[in-house]
Design a protein with these regions (language model features):
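Active-site region of glycoside hydrolase catalytic domains
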Residues: 22-24, 33-410
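N-terminal structural segment of carbohydrate-active enzymes
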Residues: 1-29, 33, 39-42
Length: 410
């Protein structure tokens, strides 16, 4: 499939338990190492660069049973995992990401309880988890920088997912401020420490004040020590951006009273208007200007770092004539070009999610994002190219968005 569309790289992730079945590096599963070596070598043999994410949400159960990502011990376990990855694959892998989507790991997993490990601890768990994941990322980056970069000469980043938040009313100062607050509290929460060394000042003050009102003697948002500020600051060679959709924002609290939560801390609500094109996912409406907007926002707030779009995609229910996906890809790539050429955003690459239909977390096999259709009822899991795969191939081959391209006519 990758050869058919002439893809230059392939983004894969490592399964922690496939490599370290007990969580730590006391037991290394050679079969797991061999599996990834074979995959990496086959990609390179076909002139496809492997792009490897170390952690994509699959924490070994034995480590979850000790508390998971709200425990400091997880940082050292992750470093063991990262070291094994760098040692075994780093001679050939030149592009790494430490984590995929801290928001889904932490806020969804340890605060809202909507993703594994399904812990509900609103307004606390997500912050505790994020703090440790950021420290784990930073230590892994420093380890690579000091021990592996001199001989392997690769790059290390992290993927942060975000909506772009537009003001509900572009002429309303209140709504414009709400959109900015939403970006600070939802994207800046993760990016600010990596870029500048600490959480956004607005976020620190906001959560501290709300914590005092709640009768607490300290903020629900953990603090970085001065040493940790220096540790975390600048731990990127590029920023990975996962972006699918956007919303229109305005100031309003959640509907759960004064109970602590991240959304109460944010104090902003958002919605997606009906005129935005619909996908098969309730959260994903089509608004290409949002991708351009978040790229510009990153440039203006963080000094125009290299940004690799690591996920961007469209879901439908089934079928091979996926014109909705084609429109999405073309429109979002055009918005990316506008960000590059009109606003000088430092975009270094684009990754479509996903190559083929897959298991989409809580929605299982019911929503399809792939360029290739997978027959999940066939024991062979037959793959069939969708119309979008041919359009995407044409874009790769020509480096041009041909709005009139029709595969059936070529």
């Amino acid at each position: 499939m990758l050869k058919e569309i002439n893809s230059q790289f392939y983004r894969i992730s490592l399964s922690w338990t496939r490599i370290l079945p007990n969580g730590g590096n006391d037991t290394i599963n050679q079969d797991g190492i061999d599996y990834y070596n074979n995959l990496i070598n086959e990609l390179l043999a076909n002139d496809i660069q492997p792009f490897v994410t170390i952690y994509h949400w699959d924490l070994p159960q034995v480590l979850q049973e000790t508390g998971g990502w709200v425990k400091d011990e997880l940082i050292d376990y992750f470093l063991q995992f990262a070291r094994v990855a760098f040692e075994n694959f780093g001679d050939r892998v030149k592009h790494w990401m430490t984590f995929n989507e801290i928001n889904q790991i932490c806020e969804a997993g340890y605060s809202e309880g909507s993703f594994a490990p399904n812990i509900v601890n609103k307004g606390i768990g997500g912050y505790e988890c994020t703090h440790r994941v950021l420290l784990a990322h930073a230590k892994a980056y420093r380890m690579y920088d000091e021990e592996f970069r001199p001989t392997q000469n690769g790059s290390v980043g992290i993927a942060i997912d975000t909506y772009f938040h537009e003001p509900r009313d572009p002429n309303s100062e209140s709504d414009k401020q709400a959109a900015e607050v939403a970006l600070i509290m939802n994207y800046g929460w993760y990016a600010n420490p990596i870029m500048l060394g600490n959480y956004p000042e607005y976020m620190i003050e906001r959560i501290r004040n709300l914590s005092l009102i709640e009768g607490r003697n300290k903020s629900r948002l953990p603090e970085f020590t001065p040493e940790q500020v220096e540790l975390v600051k600048g731990t990127y060679d590029f920023l990975g951006l996962n972006h699918y959709s956007s919303d229109l924002s305005y100031f309003a609290g959640p509907n759960d009273g004064d109970n602590p939560s991240h959304w109460r801390d944010v104090g902003v609500q958002g919605y997606q208007p009906d005129e935005w094109g619909q996908s098969a996912s309730g959260w994903l409406r089509v608004y290409p200007d949002g991708l351009r907007g978040i790229l510009i926002w990153i440039k203006e707030n963080y000094g125009n770092p290299p940004v690799l779009i690591t996920e961007n995609g469209f879901s439908d229910l089934d079928g091979l004539e996926d014109d909705g996906r084609i429109n999405y890809i073309q429109e979002y790539l055009y918005a990316t070009l506008e960000a590059i050429h009109e606003h000088q955003c430092n975009v270094i690459g684009y990754t479509y999610w996903s190559l083929m239909d897959n298991f989409e977390w809580n929605t299982g096999y019911t929503q399809r994002f792939g360029l290739y259709h997978v027959n999940f009822t066939d024991p062979e899991r037959t793959r069939t190219p969708k119309k979008s795969s041919l359009v995407y191939k044409n874009i790769i081959d020509t480096r041009h968005i041909d709005w009139d391209f029709e595969p059936s006519k070529k």
